[in-house]
Swiss-Prot record:
Residues 334-376 are annotated as: Disordered. The lineage of its organism: Eukaryota, Fungi, Dikarya, Ascomycota, Taphrinomycotina. This is Meiotically up-regulated gene 183 protein. GO terms for cellular component: chromatin; nucleus. The gene is mug183. Has a role in meiosis.
Amino acid sequence: MESNVNDEIEKAFAKDSELAKDIIKQYGKTKSIQPLVHRICKYINTLQKENESGQVKEAGSLKRKDRVQHELGQLVYGVLNLSFQAPMRKKLDVYIYENGIAVTLPGEPNLIEFWLPWNEIRCAIHVPCPRKANVQNNFVIILKSESSAENIVSSDNVKEPVFFTAPYPLKKLNLVEGLRSFTHCTNSWDIFRDYFEFIGTSTLSPSVEEFVCPNPQTGDNGTTYGVEANYKAKDGHLFFLRTGILWGFRKPILFIELASIQHFSYSNVLQRTFTVNFEAGGTIYSFDMVDQSVFRAVNDYATKHGLMDSSLAEEKAAPVPKNPSVSYLNEASSLENVDDMDDIDVKEPLFSDNDEDVENSDSEDGSESIGSEDEE
């Protein structure tokens, strides 16, 4: 019996013989841990058998060989060693098949981490990767959802977006050719967009016709599209696209379709920054610390797409600072236009004894003190 136990432990921890010896030693000394050791060994050995047999990790009873032959179709092309941030943070390989996208472990084309059929992909978004010394492309794949609020996509949702980064130049990509070659491509976005559009999957990317940020950034490849903006105290970037607005790239990644936006407004308007608010699906999404230099570009985009809502804008607008001198000038102007002073009903004197104190106090309060913006 003891020999069988030792074999079971050694098999489960074959890659670390010293650990196996320590577990065997403790197993003999402590009876209370013996049932737990059996369960752990059984679990590890079962996983090893599944990997050896090539069983698919996700739900389903098909083995990999059957899946490759009957579900994926033929290989169109592959892009290896890409940096994924969602739904997991790791380096993975991407294989584009006739029937969908297979994301696999590096160097293991048959070890599929997750599978994205074409009919479950809603759209693919490409934006430049901001604040990078080397130019890179960010890719966000939006999945279809049965939710009634599918026009508002967040990585907090059950079907969170798939997000990965690829080098911009073609020469830095590790490519695998299949049914299609890359002779007509100039960068990593060309490769993905080419086939996405071929099969009818919607694609989105920034354009100078839609929105350009006036503040140059590192890694923008000549034209800046991303606007620095905080969401729930997390720093990130807003991208104003043809059919929606993307915020990333901290979790949650957000994509709000223009068609779902009920109200749009500005708030917290200060000397250097302001806040942009979008109400969609009954929720207000506020993006803070937007630089005043991009106000005109944001306002032009909102106007172009009919997002302006005067009622909400007035409700959420920053209050006008009190200024007694303005009030006085208005009253003085009205007095100049009156011929007969007897017609004026003056209920209170224009000045009080402490007006000078009030004016000085308001002057001090009126000067905004802008603190330094903390970087996360």
